[in-house]
Amino acid sequence: MMLQTAFTDLANPSYLNMGLALLLATIMVMILWAGMRLKSPAVFVIWALTSITLIFTFVTQFSFIWFWVMVMLSLLLISIVASIRYTL
């Protein structure tokens, strides 16, 4: 329930608590770790785009949508790169 409240309030630029900041940092570290592990430039590009999206998250009124779209695209790209890399 608290996590849901934190993500609901993500659209408010003045709101950022420690738990939400930790969650965002964890997501960024996981994407960066996947990029280093898979040695794929595409994952590093997604990491940079996710950083930009986090800025949009606190600037635009559609921040909640932007954030989740970018997280889902990042995870999708990581899974595709991982499956291609380990299949070949």
Curated annotation (Swiss-Prot):
Example GO CC term: the record gives: host cell membrane
Q: Tell me if Cell cycle is a UniProt keyword of this record.
A: no
Q: Which residues form the signal peptide?
A: none
This protein's superkingdom?
A: Viruses
Question: What is the protein's given name?
Answer: Putative transmembrane protein ORF24
The topology of this chain with respect to the membrane is: Multi-pass membrane protein
| Subcellular location, record wording | Host membrane
- What keywords are annotated for this sequence in UniProt? Host membrane, Membrane, Transmembrane, Transmembrane helix
Q: Which residues cross the membrane?
A: 16-36, 42-62, 64-84
Tell me yes or no: is Iron among this UniProt entry's keywords.
no
